[in-house]
From Swiss-Prot:
Any one GO MF annotation of this record: identical protein binding
This protein's name: Contact site A protein
Gene name for this UniProt entry: csaA
Note: The expression of this stringently regulated protein during cell development is mediated through cell-surface cAMP receptors.
All copies of domain IPT/TIG, residue ranges: 21-104, 191-283
Record region (Globular): 20-453
InterPro entries for this protein: Dictyostelium_Tiger (IPR052014), Ig-like_fold (IPR013783), Ig_E-set (IPR014756)
A GO CC term assigned to this protein in UniProt: filopodium
Lineage: Eukaryota, Amoebozoa, Evosea, Eumycetozoa, Dictyostelia
Residues linked to a lipid group, GPI-like-anchor amidated serine type: 492
């Protein structure tokens, strides 16, 4: 009987030795995160003991002889390796579990901006995320960033410096514990302008500051068609700033655009966070005085710069295109054509894209010379400028008489009829506003001079018919008629005087007839 019991015990021992558990599959774990691992195989009986990579996987839940689960939270290194799994049943270790366990590598599910930071959500990441690093590269500048203190798995944050330009970024998430680097490219945020000051300025060089985020290390700004390049970005830790100095000329448009160091367009957000275009204005110019100097006009101004292409001159309905304009930021000199379509001219000072500032000037005729008048009447020639539509009158004994003259088209001379006489005659030449001679219109610009009539005729002083005007001035009071050639004709040189001898002959002949 005892011999039979010994045989049974030996049989069980031998049978157990031949029934060691086997492992055919093992599910992945999450690094540093308690995870139930499923082990598939055979011979999972009794109370198995499971180890993974030498670390206990516990507690063990046996579903059946072919499957069990155990909870595993150890952090095996390096995390990207394969580890052995052993299941012991009755002290007998399993077979087939070599290298079947590995961690599921962490992946990124979301990348998003967060108040100046790049936020990332890890899938299957470790509970301890403090060792993560992020290498950010904008194709020109790069920075190695650490996880911020408020990061909590699975969400991690990296604070991005303003020296990184917004736009498409190359992101390298460097993982600890031996996991591979995660590389991706994403446009997380744009270079953003929060303010530009000032946006209204004079036409003198003015420092303008552009403030925002993610400009990179250099930036460029375009005003109208002019580009300011290579501007250094100043980073105060919260915002970045770019300063450029405007030109003293009017730009072609009132828009401002800017690019980060990578060439990415900056966007401008208003106080509500809405994207808006950027526009600026010039402070309007001022005209302090206008003065005529011979054939030029001196306009004293402020805030006009040196870009005289924006200055125009209106004369009546026309705007001459061949004006000679010179000057400085405080004084503009315009040389006028000598013939004017109207007496009053208007200047338009345009501050680029700003409103036009205007000023008017009634041009005074300029007399350079007057020819001497014939003693017996005839014509005189007045030479000067701005005479093409001037009104001419003579003043004798405080009596004023308008005369109709013939101007040339160049505005440089007038031929006027004059009566016979002698002495010095006052001559008045006037430009009226709009060249109107209506006496009720008080706006006028007058210049005076004199001409002389000799007391006796000169050897060549013969009666000269008054010229027929080739051009009629605007209506004026009916001029006092001048003498006709017949009325002023001198005695004919053919008239014969009767001598005393002839008178005696005539007397004797008369006596003889009686």
């Amino acid at each position: 009987m005892k011999f039979l019991l010994v045989l049974i015990i030996l049989y069980n021992i031998l049978n157990s030795a031949h029934s060691a558990p086997t492992i055919t599959a093992v599910s992945n774990g999450k690094f540093g995160v308690p995870t139930y691992i499923t082990i598939t195989g055979t011979g999972f009986t009794g109370t198995p003991v499971v180890t993974i990579g030498g670390q206990t996987c516990d507690p063990v839940i046996v579903a059946n002889t072919a499957s069990l689960q155990c909870q595993f939270s150890a952090q095996l290194a390096p995390g990207n390796s394969n580890f052995d799994v052993i299941v012991k049943v009755g002290g007998v270790p399993s077979t087939g579990g070599n290298g079947l366990f590995k961690y599921t590598p962490p992946t990124l599910s979301t990348i998003f901006p967060n108040n100046g930071r790049i936020g990332m959500i890890l899938v299957d990441g470790p509970s301890n995320i403090s060792g993560y690093k992020l290498n950010v590269n904008d194709s020109i500048n790069s920075a190695m960033l650490s996880v911020t203190a408020d990061s909590v798995s699975p969400t991690i944050y990296f604070l991005v410096p303003n020296t990184i330009a917004g736009g498409l970024l190359n992101l390298e998430l460097i993982q600890p514990f031996g996991f591979s680097t995660i590389v991706t490219s994403k446009s997380v945020f744009s270079p953003t302008i929060t303010s530009i000051t000032p946006l209204a300025f004079d036409l003198t060089p003015t420092n303008v500051t552009v403030t925002g985020k993610y400009f990179g290390t250099t930036a460029s700004v375009t005003m109208g068609s002019h580009i300011y390049t290579g501007l250094t970005v100043q980073d105060d830790g919260t915002n970045c700033h770019v300063i450029f100095t405007t030109r003293s000329v009017y730009e072609s448009s009132n828009t401002i655009t800017a690019k980060a160091s990578t060439g990415v367009d900056m966007i401008y957000l208003d106080n509500q966070g809405n994207q808006q275009p950027i526009t600026f204005t010039y402070n309007p110019p001022t005209i302090t005085s206008t003065k005529q100097v011979n054939d030029s006009v001196e306009i004293s101004t402020t805030n006009t710069g040196t870009d005289f292409t924006q200055i125009s001159l209106t004369m009546g309905t026309s705007s001459p295109t061949n004006l000679v304009i010179t000057g400085t930021n405080e004084k503009i000199v315009i040389t006028l054509p000598h013939a004017l379509p109207e007496g009053e001219i208007q200047f338009n000072l345009k501050a680029g894209i700003s409103n036009v500032v205007t000023s008017t000037l009634l041009v005074t005729p300029v007399i350079n010379s007057v020819t001497q008048a014939p003693h017996n009447g005839g014509s005189i020639t007045i030479s000067g400028i701005f005479l093409n539509n001037a009104h001419v009158s003579i003043v004798v004994d405080q009596n004023t008489t308008d005369i109709v003259c013939a101007p040339d088209s160049n505005g440089e001379s007038i031929i006027c009829p004059v009566e016979a006489g002698s002495g010095t005659i006052n001559l008045v030449v006037t430009n009226y506003k709009n060249f109107a001679s209506d006496p009720t219109i008080k706006t006028e610009a007058t210049t005076s001079t004199t001409y002389t009539i000799p007391d006796t005729p000169t050897p060549t002083d013969t009666a000269t018919p008054s010229p027929t005007p080739t051009e009629t001035a605007t209506p004026s009071p009916t001029p006092k008629p001048t003498s006709t050639p017949e009325e002023t004709e001198a005695p004919s040189s053919a008239t014969t005087l009767i001598s005393p001898l002839s008178l005696i002959v005539i007397f004797i002949s008369f006596v003889l007839l009686i």
